[in-house]
Every structure is written in structure tokens, then in C-alpha cells.
């Protein structure tokens, strides 16, 4: 029958059962739990195919492989969806009902994504799926909070913090992106006290003038040496502030004189601390200004208002239109403000050097991404703010006694919701007040490997320590090195004293055919279902295997995918051809058969090396060339007449070689490989390991390449002479190909 990918892949899914693999070594893949979404683009989905290549490849090498299915779910994204599409703003309905709606939507998206993962023919453990917003998982997050609280690594303090006015919550540095935006650079004149002179300051934040407590100039800037330690008067507010020489001032920006406002940016915060200036909070938690003449306005509105006020005062020297980089919240792209808030922090500054040292014990693939992690660690200047003023996330497991001040932390390993659970103070018997804040979603996501160790130690009957002492691997995108990877290394080290991973494999990003990132804004998002329906998983996976180079972005090219569909048909047709012959054993191999068997052994030896080095694209490309250009186009053509005459050697070689091909092919295209292996060999090819064959005959491989060259030459010669390929030809067989003489005469009809 003709190749029908839908039927084959449906058969595969119906017969699928998770297989850990066989061997003493264990590889634990910390599968990235994707955040559920209504639209999942093909690049994101295909990253899981790469993880599947790793899982299948290492099973072939004799590892037991833990390859779990998991989904994220905590945090702001679902809350933003509720606000934008369900028209349910945060805080507009009962908290319990709000949480229920979030969960219902997430679960519906998860089912859709689960189907895609299965349609991709992943060898995942679908039976033991986890969600980071399940009570079981959240209970572990809370337990780790309690452990670190007891160790003194978590504390509450009021510090200036990155704050998103839209999401109304604190966020960590790792959640910030930089965007280039147009703005106004306003040149404002400050009068020098007891003088007719003015010093002009250029600023993009005139709305913060009420929080200005100093002006700095560079010590070596000759223009301002006469003003060192003089007093300037803040326009409108008539506040006296010092002019201070400071190396943080950039003489080349604006006028070289810089106004220092409490919470203008992190440089301002640093200088305030250094100079021991008293800060003033003029932005509230709604992102609105709190002092006149801009009271009640957003910072953007206040900016325009203050410019008008300053113009009326005659202190605006000029205004320039510029572009500059501003920090925005990665989730909603709202510009970040810095405001002082009381939040919980996890200590990370004392661990920076330890995590860097630990990371040197991890193998990065590709190696260059190690630097991304190190650069991020070097850039950290504050502890990690881990509390959020939202609802759909893991609750902070604390209760407070309003009478005696006792703080209770839940350490029982159960999931708690303090905002609705009653607790009586064990010291004074007073009703306690439950914490209403939740944890940063990365507090959950950063313990996936920790959770998996605990979960699978029970499933496999291995103690946690023993399982952790095996091999752990983290596959992930480069864009979350600073978040998921760093936070996991930090958290696991704080909890266990161990490195979280032996290997970190960084995948690139799937782009459209023009090299652009897929985005709804560009209208270039390709959904996995579209390509799976059109080409099938085996084809799509094999194209991806050939295309991807680990750590590099790649382009989705349908023309190339369609080309791989032809390859699948070629594999199918080879199987049909072989199936017409009855398998037979023989020890008496003819040279051509010995050559092709030698070749496939050589390829299988290389396959083992490629898998160990995570070079799946090289294996896929070499297997493709072998099947199409060598096995089908040359070997099968050379031996057709012998096989037709039931030659033992030819038929044995056909069966032997194709079984080895299917074994390697099953890493990339498991549906067709499993189906054909079952039909031809009555074997479950997924459970078959790769075999290392030792030394192979390189002289025979060399002669094989010359054999291919000779075949191509003869076919081209016949075509140029207007002959059919079956027509006779008079040509001398090269001496080095004498061992193949019998098959060459039959193939080319050499007279």
C-alpha cells in the first residue's frame, strides 16, 4: 500500500507506551514546562522535538531516560488574558472565583498543547504529567520557601524596587526588557543661590522634579568647576539642593549636569545611598504622581504638564526629540517605575560567586552560552524580590499574630492558602492574619528538576540522593538563561548544596522564512497543527533534525519540509521492495553486500558519537544521504538482479542494512520506523539500542565511494549518447573496482 502518514502515526499513538529505556545509567531531562497559550507557534513546539531526539538517542546508548511532560501555569500571563479578553480586571471579582476562572482557561489550553505534543510523536511520560499550579507542586514550592525561611535566606524589607504600574506588582530584574522609545529631552534652568547664574540640566523625566535632591557634574568638567558644592534652586518647588562633583555624571550627555531624583532610575538610587540623601516618594502604586502640580496624573501625563508649567516659569531653555532605551515589563511592556515597597527577598548576592563556580562544572552546549549566564550573574546588584501582589500563583505560606507578633510558616508539606485559611496563634491563642501576597512564578519554575527528582525516585523505587547522582540535563532557549536557568541553579544549590545539571543544551528560535521572529503582530505565526496535518510528524521531525544546529536560530521552510516528505516515501518504498523477499541468513557475503554492511556499521558507529555530542543534525544528514544516495540509488540498483534470483547474500544485506537504518531513523521519525520494523522484523525498534561495531574496513568504504563515482559516470555517459540506462555499453571497469565486477556488469549491461 502507498505511504499514508496519518494512518501510520495514528497507529503509533494508539500503540504508544512510555519506555524508560534499559541500562544502569539514568538521564533526567528537565523538560521545560511551557506556559499554556491559546496559540502555540511551530518553533516553540519543535523545541520539544529536539528534546525528544535527546531522549530517544540516549535510550539507544543504554540509558534509562526520564522525559516528563509538564506545564507551567502560575503568574501574570493568565491574569493579563482575563483582563484583556474576558474583561475581568484584577480585583474586580471574588478571589476564589478569579482563581477558578484562571484554572479553567489554563486547563483548556493545556489539553490542546498536550495533543500537539502527542501528535509530534514525542516519547514523553504522558502518564505522569505535572502542572506547576497543581496543589501537589505548589505544596513543594511552599515547603522550599519554609526551608529557606528557616535558614534565614528569605527576609522582608522595604527597598526601592522595580514596579509595574499596570500589573500593580513588584518584579525582578530578570523580568525586565529594554525598549527604544521616542521621548523629549528637556533642558531646565536651575538658579544658583545668591547669584544671577543658572545651571542647565537636561532630563527626560521633568515630572520627577519634585523628587530632585541634588545635581551632579563630572569633577573634571571645566564648565562646572565654579559651581562645585554650590546650591541650586529647584524650579517651581524652590527647594535648595547641592551641586556635587561626581564621576557618574556624563559630560557628553545633555549639558553634562544631571539632576538626581529619588527613584528616577537605579543610578539615582545608588547615588542617593552613597550621598545619604533623603528620598521622597512621589509615585504611588497605581503609577500616579502624588505632588502638585502633577498630582493624580500618570507619569506620561505629568511629564507634559510639568513641561507646560516650567515653560510658564521661563526656565525651559530648549526641548529635543530623542530616542532612548527604557525598561519595560516583559509581560505587558509597561514602562517600569522604581518605588519603595515592603516585599520579601531571597538572598542571592552572597551566592553569586558560588553559582558562577558551580556553573563551571556544567557542560554547556554550545559552550558560548556559558558567558550569557556569567554576564547575568555579574550584573546582579540586589537580592531577588520574590513576593507579588497578585492572585494566580503559589501563596506565601505565612500567618501573622496581630497581638504578640508571632509569624507562623507552614512546614507540613501541604498546600496552603493563608488568605482564606484560619489559623490560631500557638503562643497567645489569637486569631492570626494570613498573608495575601503570592510568590514570583520563577519560585515555582526554578524547582522543576527538584520536583522531578522527588517524583521519579518514588516511581522508579530509587532514593532521591541516588537519582540525583545520575545525569541531569536542562534543554531550554537562550532567552531564559537569566531567569529559568539562573534561578534553578540558585534554588537547587540553596536547597541541596548541589549543581542542578550536568548538561545545559540551548536551542535556537524558530523564525519565519524571511528570518523574522514569529509574532501575531507580523501575522507570520505558523501553528503546529497546520504542518502536522499537511506533512505528518515523521516528515516534520526529520526536516527539523536536518535543519537545526543546537544554539542557532533556524527558518521554517515549507519547501524543504515537502522535500523530506519525498524521503519518507523513499523509505516506505524501500521497505515494500525488501518485503517481497524472504529473509535468509548467510556467512558468505559478496563484495558489494560486504561494502554496504560495512558502510551502515560505520554510520552506526558515528551515530553513537553524534548523539553523545548532541549533533543530531549531522546524524540526520548523513542518514539521509546514506538511505537515498547510497543504499537506494546505488546498492539496491546494483543488486536487483541478484535479489530477484534469490541470492542469499544480497537479501541478507538488504534486511541487515535496513534494520540498522530503521533503528537510527526511529530517533527522528518514530512512526514510520516503528511500523516498518514491526512489519519486516517483528521488533519494537524503539527498544533496540545502537551497536558499536568496532573497526570497519576503511579500504572498502573508499572503494565504495569510487563505485558510486563510476556508476554516476556510466549513467551520465549513456544519457549523453542518447542511450537508455538498460542499453548495453562497452566500457572498461577500473581495476580497483574489480571486486564489484559481477554487479557492475549486470547493472550497466557492460559488453
From Swiss-Prot:
GO terms for biological process: valyl-tRNA aminoacylation. It comes from Nanoarchaeum equitans (strain Kin4-M). Belongs to the class-I aminoacyl-tRNA synthetase family. ValS type 2 subfamily. ValRS has two distinct active sites: one for aminoacylation and one for editing. The misactivated threonine is translocated from the active site to the editing site. Transmembrane segments: none annotated. This is Valine--tRNA ligase. Coiled coil: none annotated. It is an enzyme of class 6 (ligase). It is found in: Cytoplasm. It comes from the Archaea. SUPFAM superfamilies: Anticodon-binding domain of a subclass of class I aminoacyl-tRNA synthetases (SSF47323), Nucleotidylyl transferase (SSF52374), ValRS/IleRS/LeuRS editing domain (SSF50677). It catalyses: tRNA(Val) + L-valine + ATP = L-valyl-tRNA(Val) + AMP + diphosphate. Its EC number is 6.1.1.9. ATP binds at residue 520. One of its GO terms (molecular function) is ATP binding. CDD domains: Anticodon_Ia_Val. Gene3D superfamilies: HUPs, Isoleucyl-tRNA Synthetase, Domain 1. It holds the Pfam family Anticodon_1.
Amino acid at each position: 500500500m502507498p505511504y499514508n502518514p496519518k494512518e501510520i502515526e495514528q497507529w503509533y499513538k494508539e500503540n504508544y507506551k512510555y519506555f524508560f529505556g534499559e541500562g544502569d545509567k539514568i538521564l533526567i531531562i528537565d523538560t521545560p514546562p511551557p506556559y499554556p497559550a491559546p496559540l502555540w507557534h511551530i518553533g516553540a513546539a519543535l523545541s520539544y522535538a529536539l528534546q525528544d531526539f535527546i531522549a530517544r538517542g540516549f535510550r539507544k546508548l543504554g540509558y534509562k531516560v526520564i522525559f516528563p511532560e509538564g506545564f507551567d501555569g502560575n503568574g501574570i500571563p493568565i491574569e493579563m488574558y482575563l483582563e484583556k479578553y474576558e474583561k475581568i480586571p484584577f480585583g474586580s471579582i471574588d478571589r476564589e472565583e478569579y482563581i477558578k476562572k484562571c484554572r479553567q482557561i489554563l486547563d483548556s489550553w493545556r489539553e490542546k498543547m498536550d495533543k500537539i505534543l502527542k501528535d509530534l510523536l514525542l516519547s514523553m511520560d504522558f502518564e505522569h504529567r505535572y502542572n506547576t499550579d497543581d496543589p501537589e507542586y505548589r505544596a513543594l514550592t511552599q515547603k522550599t520557601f519554609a526551608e529557606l525561611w528557616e535558614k534565614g535566606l528569605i527576609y522582608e524589607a522595604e527597598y526601592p524596587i522595580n514596579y509595574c504600574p499596570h500589573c500593580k506588582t513588584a518584579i525582578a530584574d530578570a523580568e525586565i526588557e529594554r525598549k527604544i522609545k521616542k521621548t523629549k529631552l528637556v533642558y531646565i534652568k536651575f538658579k544658583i543661590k545668591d547669584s544671577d547664574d543658572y545651571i542647565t540640566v537636561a532630563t527626560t523625566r521633568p515630572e520627577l522634579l519634585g523628587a530632585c535632591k541634588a545635581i551632579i557634574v563630572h569633577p573634571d568638567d571645566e564648565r562646572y568647576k565654579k559651581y562645585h558644592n554650590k546650591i541650586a534652586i529647584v524650579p517651581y518647588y524652590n527647594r535648595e539642593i547641592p551641586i556635587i562633583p561626581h564621576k557618574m555624571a556624563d559630560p557628553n550627555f545633555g549639558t553634562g549636569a544631571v539632576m538626581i531624583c529619588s527613584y528616577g532610575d537605579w543610578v539615582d538610587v545608588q547615588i542617593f545611598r552613597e550621598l545619604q540623601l533623603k528620598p521622597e516618594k512621589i509615585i504611588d502604586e497605581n503609577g500616579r504622581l502624588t505632588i502638585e502640580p502633577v498630582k493624580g496624573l500618570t507619569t506620561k501625563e505629568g511629564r507634559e504638564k510639568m513641561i507646560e508649567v516650567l515653560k510658564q516659569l521661563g526656565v525651559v531653555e530648549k526641548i529635543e526629540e530623542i530616542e532612548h532605551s527604557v525598561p519595560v515589563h516583559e509581560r505587558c511592556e509597561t514602562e517600569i517605575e522604581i518605588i519603595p515597597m515592603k516585599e520579601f527577598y531571597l538572598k542571592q548576592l552572597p551566592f553569586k560567586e558560588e553559582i558562577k563556580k558551580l556553573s563551571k562544572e556544567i557542560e554547556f552546549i554550545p559552550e558560548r552560552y556559558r558567558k550569557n549566564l556569567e554576564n547575568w550573574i555579574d550584573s546582579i546588584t540586589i537580592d531577588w524580590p520574590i513576593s507579588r501582589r497578585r492572585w494566580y500563583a503559589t501563596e506565601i505560606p505565612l500567618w501573622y499574630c496581630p497581638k504578640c507578633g508571632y509569624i507562623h510558616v507552614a512546614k507540613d508539606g501541604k498546600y496552603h492558602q493563608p488568605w482564606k485559611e484560619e489559623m490560631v496563634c500557638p503562643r497567645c491563642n489569637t486569631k492570626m492574619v494570613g498573608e495575601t501576597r503570592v510568590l514570583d512564578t520563577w519560585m515555582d519554575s526554578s524547582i522543576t528538576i527538584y520536583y522531578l527528582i522527588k517524583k521519579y525516585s518514588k516511581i522508579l523505587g530509587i532514593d532521591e540522593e541516588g537519582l540525583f547522582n545520575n545525569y541531569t540535563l536542562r534543554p531550554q532557549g537562550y532567552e531564559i538563561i537569566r531567569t529559568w536557568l539562573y534561578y534553578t541553579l540558585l534554588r537547587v544549590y540553596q536547597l541541596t548544596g548541589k549543581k542542578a545539571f550536568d548538561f545545559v543544551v540551548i536551542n535556537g528560535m524558530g523564525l519565519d522564512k524571511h528570518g523574522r521572529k514569529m509574532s501575531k503582530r507580523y501575522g507570520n505565526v505558523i501553528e503546529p497543527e497546520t504542518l502536522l496535518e499537511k506533512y505528518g510528524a515523521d516528515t516534520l521531525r526529520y526536516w527539523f533534525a536536518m535543519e537545526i544546529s543546537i544554539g542557532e536560530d533556524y527558518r521554517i521552510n515549507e519547501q524543504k519540509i515537502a522535500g523530506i516528505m519525498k524521503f519518507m516515501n523513499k523509505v516506505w518504498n524501500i521497505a515494500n521492495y525488501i518485503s517481497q523477499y524472504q529473509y535468509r541468513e548467510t556467512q558468505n557475503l559478496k563484495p558489494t553486500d560486504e561494502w554496504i554492511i560495512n558502510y551502515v556499521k560505520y554510520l552506526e558507529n558515528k551515530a553513537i558519537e553524534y548523539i553523545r555530542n548532541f549533533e543530531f543534525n549531522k546524524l540526520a544528514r548523513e542518514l539521509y544521504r546514506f538511505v537515498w544516495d547510497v543504499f537506494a540509488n546505488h546498492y539496491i540498483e546494483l543488486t536487483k538482479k541478484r535479489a530477484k534470483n534469490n541470492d542469499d547474500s544480497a537479501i541478507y544485506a538488504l534486511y541487515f542494512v535496513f534494520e540498522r537504518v530503521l533503528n537510527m531513523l526511529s530517533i527522528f521519525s518514530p512512526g514510520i520506523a516503528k511500523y516498518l520494523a514491526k512489519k519486516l522484523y517483528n521488533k519494537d525498534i524503539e527498544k533496540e539500542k545502537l551497536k558499536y561495531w568496532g573497526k570497519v574496513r576503511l579500504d572498502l568504504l573508499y572503494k565504495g565511494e569510487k563505485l558510486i563515482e563510476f556508476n554516476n559516470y556510466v549513467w551520465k555517459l549513456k544519457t549523453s549518447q542518447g542511450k537508455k540506462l538498460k542499453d548495453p555499453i562497452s566500457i572498461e571497469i577500473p581495476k580497483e573496482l574489480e571486486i564489484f565486477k559481477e554487479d557492475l556488469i549486470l547493472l550497466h549491461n557492460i559488453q
